[in-house]
Amino acid sequence: MTEPLNLRTDVVRQHTVPRFLLKHFSKPVKGKRQRLHAFDKAAGRAYATTPDDATVRNTFYNFDNHPQRFSLEPLLGIYEHDAAPVIAGLLEHKDIRRLTEDDRYKLAVFVAVQRARTFGELERISGMISVLTDKLAAMGVTEEQAGETLGLSPGGDTRDIFLRQLVQQVSHIKHLLSKDWYLLETRPEHP
């Protein structure tokens, strides 16, 4: 019998892009840790950072106000752990035909979840809910009724919806698995 997954964590700094991926986009800088270049869309500026500091959000995957401090961080760690050797194999052999069905499944899960786990996805969901609540308010629906209709927590926090959708990726996984896959590579002179 399998042991139930412990969904509690003390991890505060949580990456929206796993470090093992970020390290592939970084280079050692003389006398310093590895660096990569990032672009802040909101501020419109590029800057250098490290894989440890890039794409970090504090307690981003934690369920707020949960009595047992549940978090999706441990589950995301499992997906990363499963996909990391598959991605390493692709980088080493540069041949997507080597993927087994199990490898393809692990990679499809990882890609589907990766698409859904970003801060941008949270903002997209928040924006969509804001538009919907405005439309409902224009039709005379109270804020409480709108929140109930949209499945919002009493405080109207869209993060609960974001966290729920993060683990509901079955249709996206199936969609990815139904596609033909190709491996593309860029060169350092033309990244």
PLM regions and their residue ranges:
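Alpha-helical structural context detector biased toward long hydrophobic helices
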Residues: 1-191
